Every structure is written in structure tokens, then in C-alpha cells.
């Protein structure tokens, strides 16, 4: 019973860390990375479709993405979708390839993205703490129902706290890495 609670807490905390990684991937740094375009939706025959389903996104060099659109009639729609996204990118079409140069980040945008990264990290920390609270409440309920002793509850609570500390430490490391990436000129 105790192990199930700890395992569930660990899995949920792992998912929180994974979600933070996805959130950080969407925050643009000065470098080109295909995940930057993950949020772009293209109007494909009347339906909004993720860009990844209508084009192959590759990194041409450290500051340029290259898109190979599968359906040549979709080139204009893909270009428009990238321009109208809130990413601040200006694609350039060269034949059947769309190149997306990454503009250099200004100091102001770097600070804005750093602030956004900190907010995402804080949200992840709060989520991990909520998972800890849920796990501790489940342990307390077990102890009240006399399914486990007070000592077992205390030991399991300490284990949950260690797990929480470990995941919050990983969140801090991820945030430091993202901030360093953002501040690198």
C-alpha cells in the first residue's frame, strides 16, 4: 500500500518534470530547434493541422530551420501559419523549401523568456508540492484507518519528502540550464 502511494507520487512528479521539459522546449532561444514550430497550426483543407503533419522540419544550421512541405500546394499556407504565429519568425520560400531564420534575441526578449521560464518552473514546483500533499494525505488516511502504524507513516512521509526534494532539485537544474541557454549570446 505504502509502496503504491510512493510509486504513484514518483510517476506523477516525473510527468510534471516531463511537462516542464516540453514547456521549456517551446520557449525560443537564439538557436534553431524543430520543437519551436510544434505549436504552429496550418489550415489544411479547412482543418487546423499541426505543422509537423504537413511538413518535415530540419535544422539547416544553428540559426536556420528548413521545412520540406509534403503537399506543394500548401507552401503558402505553411508560410502564412508561421508568420501569423506569435513566434516572431519570418519564413522565406526558395522553390519547394521554406527557410525560417531565427532572429537574434534582444536583451529585452531574453529577459521576457527568462521570466516565462521561471514562471513555468514555479508552476512545476507547485505541482510537485501538490503531489506531495496528496501522497501525505493518503498516508495519513491509511494511518487513521489503522492499516499502517505511525512509524510507517512517518518513514513513508520522509521518503515522499526526499522524492519531492529530488524532483524540485531537477526542476532547478532544468531552469538553470534554460536560463544559461537564453542568456548565451
Swiss-Prot record:
Pfam families: RRF (PF01765). Transmembrane segments: none annotated. Keywords: Cytoplasm, Protein biosynthesis. GO terms for biological process: cytoplasmic translational termination; translation. GO terms for molecular function: ribosomal large subunit binding. InterPro entries: Ribosome_recyc_fac, Ribosome_recyc_fac_dom, RRF_sf. GO terms for cellular component: cytoplasm; cytosol. The keyword Lipid biosynthesis does not apply. It is found in: Cytoplasm. SUPFAM superfamilies: Ribosome recycling factor, RRF (SSF55194). It comes from the Bacteria. Belongs to the RRF family. This is Ribosome-recycling factor. It comes from Pseudomonas aeruginosa (strain ATCC 15692 / DSM 22644 / CIP 104116 / JCM 14847 / LMG 12228 / 1C / PRS 101 / PAO1). The lineage of its organism: Bacteria, Pseudomonadati, Pseudomonadota, Gammaproteobacteria, Pseudomonadales.
Amino acid at each position: 500500500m505504502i509502496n503504491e502511494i510512493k510509486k504513484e507520487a514518483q510517476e506523477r512528479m516525473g510527468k510534471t518534470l516531463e511537462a516542464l521539459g516540453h514547456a521549456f522546449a517551446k520557449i525560443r532561444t537564439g538557436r534553431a530547434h524543430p520543437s519551436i514550430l510544434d505549436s504552429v497550426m496550418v489550415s489544411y483543407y479547412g482543418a487546423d493541422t499541426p505543422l509537423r503533419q504537413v511538413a518535415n522540419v530540419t535544422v539547416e544550421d544553428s540559426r536556420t530551420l528548413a521545412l520540406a512541405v509534403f503537399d506543394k500546394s500548401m507552401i503558402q499556407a505553411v508560410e502564412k501559419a508561421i508568420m501569423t504565429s506569435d513566434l516572431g519568425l519570418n519564413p522565406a520560400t526558395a522553390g519547394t523549401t521554406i527557410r525560417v531564420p531565427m532572429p537574434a534575441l534582444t536583451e529585452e526578449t531574453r529577459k521576457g523568456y527568462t521570466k516565462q521560464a521561471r514562471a513555468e518552473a514555479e508552476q512545476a514546483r507547485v505541482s510537485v508540492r501538490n503531489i506531495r500533499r496528496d501522497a501525505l494525505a493518503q498516508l495519513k488516511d491509511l494511518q487513521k484507518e489503522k492499516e499502517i502504524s505511525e512509524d510507517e507513516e512517518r518513514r513513508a512521509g520522509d521518503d515522499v519528502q526526499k522524492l519531492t526534494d529530488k524532483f524540485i532539485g531537477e526542476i532547478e537544474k532544468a531552469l538553470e540550464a534554460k536560463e544559461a541557454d537564453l542568456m548565451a549570446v
